[in-house]
Amino acid sequence: MEGGGKPNSSSNSRDDGNSVFPAKAPATGAGPAAAEKRLGTPPGGGGAGAKEHGNSVCFKVDGGGGGGEESAGGLEDAEGPRRQYGFMQRQFTSMLQPGVNKFSLRMFGSQKAVEKEQERVKTAGFWIIHSYSDFRFYWDLIMLIMMVGNLVIIPVGITFFTEQTTTPWIIFNVASDTVFLLDLIMNFRTGTVNEDSSEIILDPKVIKMNYLKSWFVVDFISSIPVDYIFLIVEKGMDSEVYKTARALRIVRFTKILSLLRLLRLSRLIRYIHQWEEIFHMTYDLASAVVRIFNLIGMMLLLCHWDGCLQFLVPLLQDFPPDCWVSLNEMVNDSWGKQYSYALFKAMSHMLCIGYGAQAPVSMSDLWITMLSMIVGATCYAMFVGHATALIQSLDSSRRQYQEKYKQVEQYMSFHKLPADMRQKIHDYYEHRYQGKIFDEENILNELNDPLREEIVNFNCRKLVATMPLFANADPNFVTAMLSKLRFEVFQPGDYIIREGAVGKKMYFIQHGVAGVITKSSKEMKLTDGSYFGEICLLTKGRRTASVRADTYCRLYSLSVDNFNEVLEEYPMMRRAFETVAIDRLDRIGKKNSILLQKFQKDLNTGVFNNQENEILKQIVKHDREMVQAIAPISYPQMTALNSTSSTATPTSRMRTQSPPVYTATSLSHSNLHSPSPSTQTPQPSAILSPCSYTTAVCSPPVQSPLATRTFHYASPTASQLSLMPQQQQQPQAPQTQPQQPPQQPQTPGSATPKNEVHRSTQALPNTSLTREVRPLSASQPSLPHEVSTLISRPHPTVGESLASIPQPVAAVHSAGLQAAGRSTVPQRVTLFRQMSSGAIPPNRGVPPAPPPPAAPLQREASSVLNTDPEAEKPRFASNL
């Protein structure tokens, strides 16, 4: 070359099209321009390097040291196609292996097991296809489409079309035969499932032997390219050969019918089920839809085959005069009309409703009709059986409910229950089970702990959201509490709890309205989110009120054992329950020595820390806010009650002395045992008054507490049970008025109105009590000074009025109870009223007045009506 050295003979050029162009020396006399033109160098480039645009290779046509760079460039370009080929090979190989997806994870158990299965496919041999691979999935989908097309189109083409050489028909047959031949080859390289061990067989020799023994003969015969042979020999054959070809096509149709394999259909159903899970479809609904479509499709396909067979048999006989086609003069009609009549005849036979347009006359039609009836009866029985099982599986819980209620109806008929009771039982089952029965406890027990807790929290999410106690509690405590709940339903008028019964459960209202019935005329309503009955669980006492369902109530109950089991693990929540219970009792002027002793013990041991103190403050604050929300509503009624006359009975004329107010800093441990100087004088009664102790430590006695107290609803949406006393019959202003002696007879007309003063406040007759003395409730052991008179409202379980011991006075009436009879009640000391969270100080504006010598101390009127803003401040949390 002129002006340059020889080109590097070892360097070759290779573009991205995987073509290699060796650099050849130019011919003699060609000149450098020709060589540069062949190499793609622009003219006039001289000794400059030539470079093609795009992905071409750079060349150095200069002599000297450019040979090494040219060689390196050629090797790099050669690696590109190799990497591309390796990438394609890896992608195709991965399609032959099972992928890591939801279906494979469910089949093999874990991702590691799937990876192990992938390694088995790699080591099994070349072109071994896993039965759960993506490639096999898409291939089976193509085969399904081809099978449906063949099973529908080929019978119609063979039966109703004489010309088999049209272009669409040839294309369809060629394509289907090619696909079936490829499927025949792939079946030798596809792993099979071992039915005994459910393991995928990947050994080529075992796969080949299993396929040869099972479906190979049927697939090979049905995959013979009859259409190809027919196209080759068609021109050299006469009409007789054409008839032979038609007979071969019939054989082809028979072979195609054998291609419908249950294994492929079942595998397809599994894939469809996998898609349904991916799209978050319901399992029952999805499986039911698939089964319905499979059943309907099978019935329609059998009717289609039978219709083609009805016309094919006369066709093979060249339409004899006694066949149904000739009798109906349909030999030369269009194929659509012929197919319609044939299908109608087939469906009439299969459904056993007739013989179609024409009754069978010839022997061949007779046998075809009997065959159709047998097949139709079998299919009809299968259809009815599958449909029945399908309907039952769609809603098994409703079916169980119907079976259960039939047993209930038989039970009611056997015992001859009245109609109203039967209606109540029917309504209970409707509201309790709502038409479905399932063993929820068994279902939850079969789940693991995280899933079970998640379900319980979801089911009770609205209940938790409406309860302040749960809002400030530990989430683990809430979960443990909810997992112990038991669902119950009560009808309107049902007593959920009864007064005087031993408390074994507490209740949480999910939906409904319940009323708290006390011995007074006032009632409290409980709605969604409220709970009640926890005080008896804490004190192991008896119910002090009855709760009756006003509407259908859906409740969650918690037994005392489960309650204590949960609170043992969360002592702070037990103290929270006890704090709320003390606060509630104190707001109605009652106390419980068990709760007070526990609280005093915890206070002395110093278990209350700052964090727990803040939590208890919030809980008590929520409970008090609900009481304050209902207090303005009840204030006018209670004011009217306060303004009425109180001269109905001697006990109602007793005044209440306002005890002095003590601050929290003035209380100490020594105050618990230091008696007040003004109360050290013994009382004439055999029972010493608990108010012989300081008023900062104990509360003054209350006259007829059970007859003058009632429950009040805390808030229209409250979740707490608030207890509020009614106002006493006399206002606080005339407290300094001297008390009349109890022996003064009752003045006619001076009694309070019937709707304001309870009937139990009337004077006792001179005779003895109507019933024996009822023991004090175990849930209120700290109230020996609180006595009850006759109660107008009877106990729910007793049809008579109850009697209790009246308050002892200095001068006992000659016909009243003797002091010796009252001395059997043990003396009890009320502990530390100031420490209770609900202790609201009395009105400081009224100075205390000394009581008459013959009259015991009285508790002042309900502190709920106290309008002093300082008195309404909660003092419990500050004492913690």
Swiss-Prot record:
Quote the cellular component terms of the Gene Ontology held in the record: axon; dendrite; glutamatergic synapse; HCN channel complex; plasma membrane; postsynaptic membrane; presynaptic active zone membrane
User: What's the protein name?
Assistant: Potassium/sodium hyperpolarization-activated cyclic nucleotide-gated channel 1
- Spans within the Cytoplasmic topological domain: 1-136, 189-209, 276-289, 387-880
* Cysteine disulfide links: none
Q: Could you tell me what this protein does?
A: Hyperpolarization-activated ion channel that are permeable to sodium and potassium ions. Exhibits weak selectivity for potassium over sodium ions. Contributes to the native pacemaker currents in heart (If) and in neurons (Ih). Participates in cerebellar mechanisms of motor learning. May mediate responses to sour stimuli.
In which residues is 3',5'-cyclic AMP bound? 533-534, 536, 543-544, 584, 587
Q: What is known of its domains?
A: The segment S4 is probably the voltage-sensor and is characterized by a series of positively charged amino acids at every third position.
Q: Which organism is it from?
A: Oryctolagus cuniculus
Pfam families noted in UniProt: cNMP_binding (PF00027), Ion_trans (PF00520), Ion_trans_N (PF08412)
Q: According to Swiss-Prot or TrEMBL, what is its membrane topology?
A: Multi-pass membrane protein
